From Swiss-Prot:
One CC-aspect GO term: cytoplasm
Function in brief: Divisome component that associates with the complex late in its assembly, after the Z-ring is formed, and is dependent on DivIC and PBP2B for its recruitment to the divisome. Together with EzrA, is a key component of the system that regulates PBP1 localization during cell cycle progression. Its main role could be the removal of PBP1 from the cell pole after pole maturation is completed. Also contributes to the recruitment of PBP1 to the division complex. Not essential for septum formation.
Cross-referenced PANTHER family: CELL CYCLE PROTEIN GPSB (PTHR35794:SF1), CELL DIVISION PROTEIN DIVIVA (PTHR35794)
Name the UniProt record assigns to this protein: Cell cycle protein GpsB
Coiled-coil ranges from the UniProt annotation: 34-71
Quaternary structure, from the entry: Forms polymers through the coiled coil domains. Interacts with PBP1, MreC and EzrA.
UniProt source species: Bacillus velezensis (strain DSM 23117 / BGSC 10A6 / LMG 26770 / FZB42)
Amino acid sequence: MLADKVKLSAKDILEKEFKTGVRGYRQEDVDKFLDMIIKDYETFHQEIEELQQENLQLKKQLEEASKKQPVQSNTTNFDILKRLSNLEKHVFGSKLYDE
């Protein structure tokens, strides 16, 4: 998924060779900078993997919670009806249910 969008990997950066010219860049500076970029790429890659795993886990939890929710709702409705029935018996007496 992400590999399709990213053009360079940490390995590509590490293995990149630069041609030197008469007045080219200092090799040491280029290497240090590339090392920083490689570390950043590795950090970003690791963070992305962790976030994708967390995202997958949260989606599974959401799916499980949404499956359980209707059962809880039905139970709650049943409990409410039962309590209402008991209150009616108490308020109106048993005459309401004897008829």
